[in-house]
Amino acid sequence: MTSERSIIIGGGGFAGLALAIALRQGLGSQTPIIVADPALATRPSRDPRATAIVAACRRLFEVIGAWDGVAAKAQPILDMVITDSKLEDATRPVFLTFGGDVAPGEPFAHMVENGDLIESLTRCAEAAKIDLRATAVTSYDARPDGITVSLGDGTVIEGALLVAADGARSKLRERAGIVTHGWDYNQSGIVVTVGHERDHEGRAEEHFMPAGPFASLPLTGKRSSLVWTESRAEAARIVALGDDDFHRELEQRFGLHLGEIKALDKPRAFPLSYFVARSFIGERLALIGDAAHVIHPIAGQGLNLGLKDVAALAEVIVDAARLGIDVGQADVLERYQRWRRFDTMAMGLATNTLNFLFSNTSTLLRSLRDIGLGLVDRAPPLKNILIRQAAGLSGDVPRLLRGETL
């Protein structure tokens, strides 16, 4: 059943499903919530990537019930080390270490495999009786009094709001005429899961190299998820190598500090780019997740940034609905945009700056950044501020990210 109160979400990935579940909890069953995405019919082959879910976003997943499905498979990140070196350097001195919890017994992040997370969100959406449609939003007509949404299966839905959660190449954003500002890094992130002889003890490592960062992120068991950045051409060469040649490239970067290593799946390369939408809203339209922004993975904040959108938009919608306000009207959506766009721009600036500072061969820049890392390492109060910032717990934090229900 649909009505003028319906909220339609175009896109059934992490952000779209999380928003749907949060809205169901906050609005109850009287508001129809529809998620439309062809991928709901059959998920593609299991995503080989894993994601660092920061503490604030883990709290969101706990509130909406999705954390139970991944908790046993999630690996807490207990500490992190950062080095700055060239590929040929014999040693990699540690310039910065992070450790400790954001609250007693609460690590600042957990590593979760993407396949496990999407499965848990899908189960929660089904349990919440979200109207899941395995088809795309093909067009819509927004008016001052509502929005008419057409789906690929011929269904026409009357509603109050359409949410674009359809990824970086968002058709809904394009249909709204919302332009983006950004650029291609001419870099790719190589992703592969490795097994190793010794336990990582929950330690994440980020090695800054001239071509880009090489990150080793702990998974359950004696496994780690590697994300390493190379130029587009070099990444294509590396992923095309045979097993033995790839192992040599891997060992040269990873080292043997955890004993012998072995790739557990085929490496894949994902192109890296940056953009932010000029507006996060249109007439009866809100953009979330990759439809609104894509940033460099150097800080591991991409998905977390989208989940912050989810928490803010859900709170804005639920608060408006409880006051009897039309959730799709302009001033409601403006509140969401004011809340999220500055934080997104700030994170984009930070990741772009880090990528520039660390993905180069300048001796002067290397000296300056190493001095900076060393100073931060010797300033515990500053490190604590950075940890809380990275964990999503600083600034104007939405209720869901504080672990509170709507």
Positions of predicted regions on the chain:
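Conserved N-terminal helical subregion
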Residues: 2-3, 73-175, 183-188, 243
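FAD/FMN-dependent oxidoreductases across multiple families
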Residues: 236-331
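C-terminal helical "tail/cap" subdomain of flavin- and related membrane-associated enzymes
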Residues: 315-406
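Beta1/beta-strand and adjacent pyrophosphate-binding region of the FAD-binding site
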Residues: 2-13
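N-terminal Rossmann-fold NAD(P) dinucleotide-binding loop
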Residues: 16
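Conserved FAD-binding catalytic core of PHBH/FMO-like flavoproteins
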Residues: 61, 148, 156, 161-267
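Glycine-rich FAD pyrophosphate-binding loop
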Residues: 24-49
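N-terminal FAD cofactor-binding segment of flavoenzymes
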Residues: 46-87
